[in-house]
Swiss-Prot record:
Tissue specificity of this protein: Ubiquitously expressed.
Transmembrane segments: 25-45, 66-86, 106-126, 162-182, 201-221, 234-254, 514-534, 561-581, 602-622, 652-672
Designated name of the protein: Sodium-dependent phosphate transporter 1
PANTHER family assigned to the protein according to its UniProt record, in alphabetical order: PHOSPHATE TRANSPORTER (PTHR11101), SODIUM-DEPENDENT PHOSPHATE TRANSPORTER 1 (PTHR11101:SF46)
Catalysed transformations (reactions): 2 Na(+)(out) + phosphate(out) = 2 Na(+)(in) + phosphate(in)
Organism annotation: Mus musculus
Cysteine-cysteine disulfides: none
Length: 681
C-alpha cells in the first residue's frame, strides 16, 4: 500500500520530463509548498500516534519524551528512507497518459490532492480519530482525476484493495498480536515468579524486534542508503545476522544486569511499605511503632512531614500511608489508617504535610480520624493499579523517602489533577468520595457498583474511574448515611453492569519486574516504527511537492534524485504537527481504546510490524494505522473482555469508511475551481 502513495510523484515526473518549463506557474509551486507543509503537519498530528501511542499509554515514556524521540526518528527516517518517492511506480491510481498535453492540469491536481488530504486529516485529528494518511492521499487523487478526465482516468482495482484493507489489516494484525500476547501471558505473566522465564525470553524478543524491523527498513530499497542494490537473500542474511548478534549480546550482558536490577529495585522492596513515617521517639530513629486500632477512638493522630532540623523536629504520632497494589487482600487492620485529603480550595488544617515528588509536584496529606473509624474497626483504603502512569514514581521512589527529606506548608498545592489522572490522584491521596461527588457526581447521576468478594460480604467497593480507568477506590460500609455515596463512572458503567468478582476480569496488570523487562523493548519497537514511518509516510506529504519542484526545475525523469532538503522539509512539518496536536490521537491509541501495559504494548508493536512486512511481501492490501488499531483492540480484549471501548472503535472504523470519499470530494471541489475558474484564464 505504501508504494501507492508515490503514484502522483513518479507519474507526474515521468509525463512532464519532456515538457517545456512552466515558469509562469511559479505561484502554483509556492502554493504547493505551503499546502505540503500543512499536509505534513496533519500527518504528524495523526499518523505519528501509530508509533508512540502505546508507549505513552503504558507509561514507559512521557508525552514529552515521545515527542522528542519521534521528532528525531521521523526526521532521520524521512531523510534516509524517503528518497524512494522519486522512483517510478508503474501501477498507479490514475492513467497519467491522459495528461500528456495538459501538464498544468496535472500539477493543479497534485495541489488539489494535497489540500483534500490535509483537510480531512486535520479534522480527524481534532476528533481524535486515527486514520490512514495513505488512504487520504489515494482518495484525494481519485477525486481530482474524476473532475479532470472522468471515470476513464481512474484505476478502480486500487480502490477495491483499499476497501479490502479496512478488514484485512485490523483482522490479520489483531490475530498475530493476540497470539503473541497469549504466549507472553501464558509463559511469563501468569507465572508466580515471571523473572526466570522473562529473562530466558528476553534474547528472543530482542532478536525478533531487531530482525523484523531491519528487514522492513532494508526491504524498502532506500536509494540513499544503497538498499535498492541489495538482493532479497542479502537483506534476509543481514537481518538474521544482526538479530543473532543482538540476542547474544542480550543473553551475556543485558540479562545478568537486568536480573540484578530487578532484585535490587523490585524484590528487595515489599509491595506495601510506608511512604512517609514519623518516629514516636527521636532517640529510636530505627524503630517502627505500631498504632493499635483501639487507640484511635481516644486519640486524633495528625501526620506532619517536617524538615530534619533541630527545633522543627517535634515529637508526633506515627502515620503510615498504605497503598495496596492490585486486588484486595486482607491485611491487619492496624496497618491501614483512614486518610482524607482536603480540597485544594479548602485546606484549613493547622498541621499539613506535603510530599514532594521527583518531578516537582506535591502530594498534600491531611488526616482527619474522628468519625472515620468506629468501634467495629471499619477503615478506608485505596487500591492503585500497577500500569498507571505514576505507579513507579509513587512506589519505587517515595517509599525510600526518609523523615526530613521534604517539607511542605499549608500553601502547597496538591498533586495536579487533570482529565487523565483525576480519579487516580484522588485515590492515592485519599480524597473523600463525597468531595468528588459534590463536584462531578451530580452531572449525570450517581452510579454505584457492588462487587462480591469472598470473606467480605459486608463491604462495598466504590469504583472511581478516570476516562482511562486507571484506578479504583475501596471503601468499607460505615453507616446508613454513607450508603448513598457513589461516584460517577466516566467510562460508561452501562457496558460493565453485572460484573462481580476480581478486578482481573477488567485488567490484567504487569508486575513491576515484568514492566522492567518489557519497558526498553517497547521503546525500541516504537523508535523503529517511527523511523520507518518517517520514510514511508513522508511521501504522503512531500511526494506531490517533489514532483512539482522537479518539473519546475526541468529535472524530472524516471531516475531523478529527490532533493534531501525537501524530505527534511516534510520531516519538520511532521514534527511540528506532532508537538502541537499529536497528543490527541496518541491519547486515543494509548489510553482511550484500552489500557496498555509494557507487555501488551510490546506485543502490539512487534506483531503490527511483522504483519506489515508479511502482508506487503505477499501482496495483501495493508495499512499501518489499521494494523495498529486492530492489534490494540485484540490485545485489550484478551487482557480483559470488558476493557475495550467498543463505541470508540466503532467511530474509528466509520472514520476509515468515510476517509476516501471525504478527501476525494474536497480534492474534487478544489480541482473544479482550478479547471473551470483559474486555469482557463
Amino acid at each position: 500500500m505504501e508504494s501507492t502513495v508515490a503514484t502522483i510523484t513518479s507519474t507526474l515526473a515521468a509525463v512532464t520530463a519532456s515538457a517545456p518549463p512552466k515558469y509562469d506557474n511559479l505561484w502554483m509551486l509556492i502554493l504547493g509548498f505551503i499546502i505540503a507543509f500543512v499536509l505534513a503537519f496533519s500527518v504528524g498530528a495523526n499518523d505519528v500516534a501509530n508509533s508512540f501511542g502505546t508507549a505513552v499509554g503504558s507509561g514507559v515514556v512521557t508525552l514529552k519524551q515521545a515527542c522528542i524521540l519521534a521528532s528525531i526518528f521521523e526526521t532521520v527516517g524521512s531523510a534516509l528512507l524517503g528518497a524512494k518517492v522519486s522512483e517510478t511506480i508503474r501501477n498507479g491510481l490514475i492513467d497519467v497518459e491522459l495528461y500528456n498535453e495538459t501538464q498544468d492540469l496535472l500539477m493543479a491536481g497534485s495541489v488539489s490532492a494535497m489540500f483534500g488530504s490535509a483537510v480531512w486529516q486535520l479534522v480527524a485529528s481534532f476528533l481524535k480519530l486515527p486514520i490512514s494518511g495513505t488512504h487520504c492521499i489515494v482518495g484525494a487523487t481519485i477525486g481530482f482525476s474524476l473532475v479532470a478526465n472522468g471515470q476513464k482516468g481512474v484505476k478502480w482495482s486500487e480502490l477495491i484493495k483499499i476497501v479490502m484493507s479496512w478488514f484485512v489489516s485490523p483482522l490479520l494484525s489483531g490475530i498475530m498480536s493476540g497470539i503473541l500476547f497469549f504466549l507472553v501471558r501464558a509463559f511469563i505473566l501468569r507465572k508466580a515468579d515471571p523473572v526466570p522465564n522473562g529473562l530466558r525470553a528476553l534474547p528472543i524478543f530482542y532478536a525478533c524486534t531487531i530482525g523484523i524491523n531491519l528487514f522492513s527498513i532494508m526491504y524498502t530499497g532506500a536509494p540513499l542508503l544503497g538498499f535498492d542494490k541489495l538482493p532479497l537473500w542479502g537483506t534476509i542474511l543481514i537481518s538474521v545476522g544482526c538479530a543473532v548478534f543482538c540476542a547474544l549480546i542480550v543473553w551475556f550482558f543485558v540479562c545478568p544486569r537486568m536480573k540484578r536490577k530487578i532484585e535490587r529495585e523490585v524484590k528487595s522492596s515489599p509491595s506495601e511499605s510506608p511512604l512517609m513515617e514519623k518516629k514516636s521517639n527521636l532517640k529510636e530513629d530505627h524503630e517502627e511503632t505500631k498504632m493499635a486500632p483501639g487507640d484511635v477512638e481516644h486519640r486524633n493522630p495528625v501526620s506532619e512531614v517536617v524538615c530534619a532540623t533541630g527545633p522543627l523536629r517535634a515529637v508526633v504520632e506515627e502515620r503510615t500511608v498504605s497503598f495496596k497494589l492490585g486486588d484486595l487482600e486482607e491485611a491487619p487492620e492496624r496497618e491501614r489508617l483512614p486518610m482524607d485529603l482536603k480540597e485544594e480550595t479548602s485546606i484549613d488544617s493547622t498541621i499539613n504535610g506535603a510530599v514532594q515528588l521527583p518531578n516537582g509536584n506535591l502530594v498534600q496529606f491531611s488526616q482527619t480520624v474522628s468519625n472515620q473509624i468506629n468501634s467495629s474497626g471499619h477503615y478506608q483504603y485505596h487500591t492503585v493499579h500497577k500500569d498507571s502512569g505514576l505507579y513507579k514514581e509513587l512506589l519505587h521512589k517515595l517509599h525510600l523517602a526518609k523523615v526530613g527529606d521534604c517539607m511542605g506548608d499549608s500553601g502547597d498545592k496538591p498533586l495536579r489533577r487533570n482529565n487523565s489522572y483525576t480519579s487516580y490522584t484522588m485515590a492515592i491521596c485519599g480524597m473523600p468520595l463525597d468531595s468528588f461527588r459534590a463536584k462531578e457526581g451530580e452531572q449525570k447521576g450517581d452510579e454505584m457498583e457492588t462487587l462480591t468478594w469472598p470473606n467480605a460480604d459486608t463491604k462495598k467497593r466504590i469504583r472511581m474511574d478516570s476516562y482511562t480507568s486507571y484506578c479504583n477506590a475501596v471503601s468499607d460500609l460505615h453507616s446508613e448515611s454513607e450508603m448513598d455515596m457513589s461516584v460517577k463512572a466516566e467510562m460508561g458503567l452501562g457496558d460493565r453492569k453485572g460484573s462481580s468478582g476480581s478486578l482481573e476480569e477488567w485488567y490484567d496488570q504487569d508486575k513491576p519486574e515484568v514492566s522492567l523487562l518489557f519497558q526498553f523493548l517497547q521503546i525500541l519497537t516504537a523508535c523503529f516504527g517511527s523511523f520507518a514511518h518517517g520514510g514511508n509516510d513522508v511521501s504522503n506529504a512531500i511526494g506531490p511537492l517533489v514532483a512539482l519542484y522537479l518539473v519546475y526545475k526541468q529535472e524530472a525523469s524516471t531516475k531523478a534524485a529527490t532533493p534531501i532538503w525537501l524530505l527534511l522539509y516534510g520531516g519538520v512539518g511532521i514534527c511540528m504537527g506532532l508537538w502541537v496536536w499529536g497528543r490527541r490521537v496518541i491519547q486515543t491509541m494509548g489510553k482511550d481504546l484500552t489500557p496498555i501495559t509494557p507487555s501488551s504494548g510490546f506485543s502490539i508493536e512487534l506483531a503490527s510490524a511483522l504483519t506489515v512486512v508479511i502482508a506487503s511481501n505477499i501482496g495483501l492490501p495493508i495499512s499501518t494505522t489499521h494494523c495498529k488499531v486492530g492489534s490494540v483492540v485484540s490485545v485489550g480484549w484478551l487482557r480483559s473482555k470488558k476493557a475495550v471501548d467498543w463505541r470508540l472503535f466503532r467511530n474509528i472504523f466509520m472514520a476509515w469508511f468515510v476517509t476516501v470519499p471525504i478527501s476525494g470530494v474536497i480534492s474534487a471541489a478544489i480541482m473544479a475551481v482550478f479547471k473551470y475558474i483559474i486555469l482557463p484564464v
